[in-house]
């Protein structure tokens, strides 16, 4: 029961669905004969939902839970609804939809908005705002935020406590920065972005040049003069870092979703609607196409080009360009330690074994 409306605010199921952003999802209701449509106060899983909550079935492995769920209504696919009808199963109001997971997402968004504390617009008295900064009258700036010179905060934007917006940076309309987000100078965040706590955008990229005048093996710093540009409808997870470009900006396209603890180095470009799971490291100047997915803990070398519609499995090390859409995996499977040691010993001898095999073939 993650979200519940007060009893007086419960909504009839059809009213709730009509009030969500469910247009185009082609849903309809299937109710037992003479059943009244339930009033809904929340949303939950099949195993945890109560009698005033709606649930959903999108993964067939949980289909057996339909028989025991207490949910007032369940979102299912047309195939599941037809199968239940043929089996004579009854008792639940069904919301029949080709995309139950997407309809669940829309409902979750509605409940999140409905339960969000409204809070007044304005700037908290403890915030420090440079006189040249521009803050829209409908924006909300939390306690102990710092807004530096020339920064702009758009209409309906919300900044949680302790956020820092550097000089000349912008936060677009209706964007949400959770507590302690840091935007260095020259970082531009689009509209409807969500940035979670601890994220840092615009820190210096890792740029150094060998400089023998400073000593043997010494490095001279290369100032990072670019910025960071984040598109519309982007979400950035907690403690993710996006470095500023050396000269050109680091770019995160529209609709990109970044999980927690991702490292995006300087001058990386991430195409629209790409989703990247936690703990991925992307080295400098790599370009990732649109609609890609990158599994957790993957590593991408620098100066690479990744095509559109590429799916990279978790833990993969990408060290060369990927020019063709598709799924790519480069993970050595786990095994019991003793077996892994034996396999590793064989791998180290592959070149020798190959030479021996070729010699045998020539005989």
Swiss-Prot record:
InterPro entries: Hexapep (IPR001451), Hexapep_transf_CS (IPR018357), LpxD (IPR007691), Trimer_LpxA-like_sf (IPR011004), UDP_GlcNAc_AcTrfase_non-rep (IPR020573). GO terms for molecular function: N-acyltransferase activity. GO terms for cellular component: membrane. Pathway: Bacterial outer membrane biogenesis; LPS lipid A biosynthesis. Its EC number is 2.3.1.191. PROSITE patterns: HEXAPEP_TRANSFERASES. Keywords: Acyltransferase, Lipid A biosynthesis, Lipid biosynthesis, Lipid metabolism, Repeat, Transferase. This is UDP-3-O-acylglucosamine N-acyltransferase. It comes from Bordetella bronchiseptica (strain ATCC BAA-588 / NCTC 13252 / RB50) (Alcaligenes bronchisepticus). The lineage of its organism: Bacteria, Pseudomonadati, Pseudomonadota, Betaproteobacteria, Burkholderiales.
């Amino acid at each position: 029961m993650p979200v519940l409306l007060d009893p007086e605010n419960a909504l009839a199921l059809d009213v709730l669905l009509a009030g969500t952003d469910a247009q185009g999802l082609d849903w309809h209701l299937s109710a037992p004969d003479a059943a009244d449509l339930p009033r809904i106060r929340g949303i939950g899983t099949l195993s945890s939902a109560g009698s005033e909550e709606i649930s959903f079935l999108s993964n067939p492995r949980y289909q057996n839970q339909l028989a025991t769920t207490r949910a007032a209504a369940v979102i299912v696919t047309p195939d599941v609804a037809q199968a239940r009808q043929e089996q004579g199963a009854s008792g639940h109001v069904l919301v029949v939809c080709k995309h139950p997971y997407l309809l669940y997402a829309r409902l979750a968004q509605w409940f999140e908005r409905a339960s969000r504390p409204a809070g007044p617009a304005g700037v908290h008295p403890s915030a420090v705002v440079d006189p040249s900064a521009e803050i829209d009258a409908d924006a909300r700036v939390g306690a102990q935020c710092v807004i530096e010179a020339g920064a702009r905060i758009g209409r309906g934007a919300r900044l949680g406590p302790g956020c820092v917006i550097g000089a000349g940076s912008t936060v677009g309309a209706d964007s949400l920065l959770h507590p302690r987000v840091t935007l260095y100078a020259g970082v531009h965040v689009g509209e409807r972005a969500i940035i979670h706590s601890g994220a840092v955008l615009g820190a210096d990229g890792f740029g150094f040049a060998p400089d023998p005048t400073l000593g043997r093996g010494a490095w001279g710093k290369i100032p990072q003069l670019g910025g960071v540009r984040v598109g519309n409808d982007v979400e950035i997870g907690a403690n993710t870092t996006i470095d500023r470009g050396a000269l050109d900006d680091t770019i995160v396209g529209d609709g990109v979703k970044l999980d927690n603890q991702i490292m995006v180095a300087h001058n990386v470009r991430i195409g629209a609607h790409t989703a990247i799971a936690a703990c991925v490291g992307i080295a400098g100047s790599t370009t990732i196409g649109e609609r890609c997915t990158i599994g957790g803990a993957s590593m991408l070398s620098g100066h690479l080009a990744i095509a559109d519609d590429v799916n990279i499995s978790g833990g993969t090390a990408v060290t060369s360009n990927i020019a063709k859409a598709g799924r790519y995996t480069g993970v050595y499977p786990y095994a019991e330690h003793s077996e892994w040691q034996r396999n590793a010993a064989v791998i180290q001898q592959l070149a020798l074994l190959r030479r021996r095999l070729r010699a045998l073939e020539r005989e």
